[in-house]
Curated annotation (Swiss-Prot):
Belongs to the bacterial ribosomal protein bL36 family. The gene is rpmJ. PANTHER family: 50S RIBOSOMAL PROTEIN L36, CHLOROPLASTIC, LARGE RIBOSOMAL SUBUNIT PROTEIN BL36C. The lineage of its organism: Bacteria, Bacillati, Cyanobacteriota, Cyanophyceae, Synechococcales. This is Large ribosomal subunit protein bL36. The keyword DNA repair does not apply.
Length: 37
């Protein structure tokens, strides 16, 4: 899980979602998981 000020899709499988007011990226590739913070 990467914590970044700016979350961006890293590939075409990445999905940008909101969970509990946080912007997150979920993907089939675990290396692409990101959270805004």
């Amino acid at each position: 899980m990467k914590v970044r000020a700016s979350v961006k899709r890293m590939c075409d499988k990445c999905r940008v979602i909101r969970r509990h007011g946080r912007v997150m990226v979920i993907c089939a590739n675990p290396k692409h998981k990101q959270r805004q913070g």
